[in-house]
Amino acid sequence: MHVFENFEEVKAAIGTEVGASEWLEVTQKRIDQFAEATGDQQWIHVDVERARRELPTHTTIAHGLLTLALAPWFVRSVIGLKAIKNTLKYGANRIRYLTPVPAGSKLRGRISILAAEDAPQDGLRVTYGITTELQGSERPACVAEMIAVHYC
């Protein structure tokens, strides 16, 4: 984990890759829980038997939004910010789902800092580049720019 002591250190890291998270398994249970939470019960995500018969992967695949929803976990496991009281998610840019994520596969996030600027109320708005890698695949599962505002 890379720990930044203050906002100035974050700003100095603009344009750099900070690191990659550990691999995280995307289990069928996680997919089912996400489907339940979001109401997205499309069979390609939750019907294991039908997926075995009809999908090229022969298994269910994770929701693209589940893949994206792992971004905060990836960032927190790679970057530490001292003296932070809280963080609010501000938005996302340029989200692309490039490779399906089969149930049981592993993902990790490769994190870079694309931009950092002062925000109101002693905040720092940071745009993170997140490349979600799928273990065993040359293409990433997802690429996105996630924006967060950190407050001290």
Regions found by a protein language model. Give the residues of each.
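HotDog/MaoC-like acyl-thioester-processing domains
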Residues: M1-A13, P100-C152
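Hot-dog-fold acyl-thioester-processing enzymes
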Residues: M1-K89
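Short alpha-helix capping/helix-loop boundary micro-motifs
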Residues: A92-Y97
